[in-house]
């Protein structure tokens, strides 16, 4: 019924959408497709530099296949990776003993969810030397071959893992390490040493970069291509696997590669921070800020759900009241949310003078207030609708079932200006201009 009603309400939009996507094939043209044939690239060096800068690596390979460019690649020396899958208590204790001898530990958690307040730990990888790593499995498929089923005493596994993070003099390295620390805290494990986040360091060095994913950082700084996660879990969609469903040998290598690459990135990024005289900002501002954000995210935000519901009901009635006022001006009912229907009402039926062609944007409605009171009611309608749909109804859906609080994520690497941003949900974009918003 919902889909049927949506189709009925948006019939005008559907016909317009069809018209917009229909290719017009009856045009008179004076050129042929051969006129647009791509024959050569004059400035090949700049093309290669540009696609590298914008991380468009697939374009280079396509151009090479078409023989438009030839990239001279030195043969890469592939180093042997010493990644160990921990399968029993003896291997676990030996690994922990080896790890604790180092004062620099890079680690990465494999989990079941991108939300740190609900994710379960699938396994943990740790590296203290380049091209080396240990993977400690926690969750894994039940249909494993008998030779590789872990025989670890899992009753005290987190007490064992806690030893690794109980070293105040140790530097702990990670990619988006805030996420991992939040999960470990939920499991009763505190990371007590100093911290280095490769993602934050890369953002500080280049705040306008398109992506700070470790795959891209690895290519740029290490000239090393990591295993794409899609190779393990498949593309996004209903058939995508969980990390806990991946064979141990595959997830072990993938996870160790993450902690290994983060360790190698640390050396280069820390050197670059010093070179650009950004190390003080990183260690005295960014990392302390991250620690505060960890506490804020973990604590969460308490909201009065009953108040949200009551206010949502009130705003719902306000929306109905404003809708009736709008219809009283037009003497006809229409879909207020349809830009096409609204523009027809404003400019054809009521005869208002268009400000920006037939736009019905907020700034246009502000101008139209001078011509007709319907514009004021339309602005009220949009304001109330946004309050109800985006905030009053949406924010309570983010309540954590165990804490009954909202645990938003504060991000240091999204805005190029350095300001914090908030996601899932966004708590920084709540309107406060009107009395009811406040």
Which residues does each PLM region occupy?
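Conserved "right-hand" nucleotidyltransferase catalytic core of DNA-directed polymerases
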Residues: 6, 10-147, 209, 217, ...
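Amphipathic coiled-coil/heptad-repeat helices and related helical stalk/stem segments
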Residues: 88-92, 153-158, 177, 247
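Acidic beta-strand-to-loop metal/phosphate-binding motif
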Residues: 106, 169-177
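Catalytic cores of nucleotide-enabled group-transfer and carboxylate-activating enzymes in metabolic
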Residues: 106-108, 157-163, 196
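Short, basic/hydrophobic alpha-helical segments
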Residues: 151-169
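Conserved nucleotide-binding/hydrolysis micro-motifs of P-loop NTPases
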Residues: 178-181, 200, 209, 341
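Short Gly/Thr/Asp-enriched flexible loops that form oxyanion-binding sites at enzyme active sites
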Residues: 180-188
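Conserved beta-strand -> loop -> alpha-helix junction used to position metal-binding or nucleic-acid-contacting
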Residues: 190-207, 214
């Amino acid at each position: 019924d919902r889909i049927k009603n949506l189709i009925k309400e948006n019939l005008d939009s559907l016909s317009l959408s069809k018209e917009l996507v229909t290719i017009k094939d009856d045009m008179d043209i004076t050129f042929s497709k051969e006129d647009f044939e791509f024959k050569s690239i004059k400035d090949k060096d700049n093309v290669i530099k540009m696609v590298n800068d914008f991380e468009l690596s697939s374009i280079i390979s396509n151009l090479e296949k078409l023989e438009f460019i030839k990239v001279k690649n030195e043969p890469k020396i592939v180093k042997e990776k010493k990644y160990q899958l921990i399968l029993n208590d003896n291997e676990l204790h030996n690994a922990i003993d080896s790890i604790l001898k180092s004062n620099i530990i890079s680690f990465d958690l494999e989990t079941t969810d991108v939300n740190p307040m609900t994710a379960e730990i699938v396994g943990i990888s740790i590296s203290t030397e380049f091209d080396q790593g240990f993977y400690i499995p926690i969750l894994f498929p039940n249909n494993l071959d008998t030779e590789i089923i872990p025989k670890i005493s899992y009753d005290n596994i987190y007490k064992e893992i806690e030893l690794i993070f109980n070293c105040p003099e140790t530097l702990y390295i990670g990619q988006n390490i805030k996420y991992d620390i939040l999960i470990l805290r939920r499991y009763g494990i505190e990371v007590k040493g100093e911290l280095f986040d490769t993602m934050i360091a890369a953002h500080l060095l280049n705040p306008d970069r398109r992506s700070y994913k470790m795959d891209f950082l690895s290519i740029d700084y290490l000239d090393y291509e990591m295993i794409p996660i899609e190779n393990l879990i498949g593309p996004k969609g209903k058939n995508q696997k969980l990390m806990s469903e991946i064979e141990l040998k595959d997830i072990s290598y993938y996870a160790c590669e993450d902690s290994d690459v983060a360790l190698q990135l640390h050396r280069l990024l820390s050197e670059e921070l010093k070179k650009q005289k950004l190390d003080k900002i990183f260690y005295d501002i960014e990392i302390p800020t991250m620690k505060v954000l960890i506490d804020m995210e973990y604590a969460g935000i308490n909201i009065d759900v009953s108040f949200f519901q009551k206010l949502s009901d009130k705003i719902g009635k306000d929306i109905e009241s404003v809708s009736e006022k709008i219809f009283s001006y037009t003497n006809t009912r229409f879909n207020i949310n349809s830009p096409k229907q609204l523009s027809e009402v404003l400019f054809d039926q009521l005869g208002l003078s268009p400000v920006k062609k037939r736009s019905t944007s907020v700034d246009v409605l502000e101008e139209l207030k001078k011509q007709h009171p319907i514009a004021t009611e339309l602005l009220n309608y949009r304001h109330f609708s946004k309050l109800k749909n985006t905030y009053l109804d949406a924010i309570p859906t983010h309540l954590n079932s165990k804490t009954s609080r909202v645990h938003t994520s504060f991000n240091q690497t999204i805005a190029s200006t350095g300001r914090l941003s908030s996601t899932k949900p966004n708590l920084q974009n709540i309107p406060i201009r009107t009395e009811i918003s406040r």
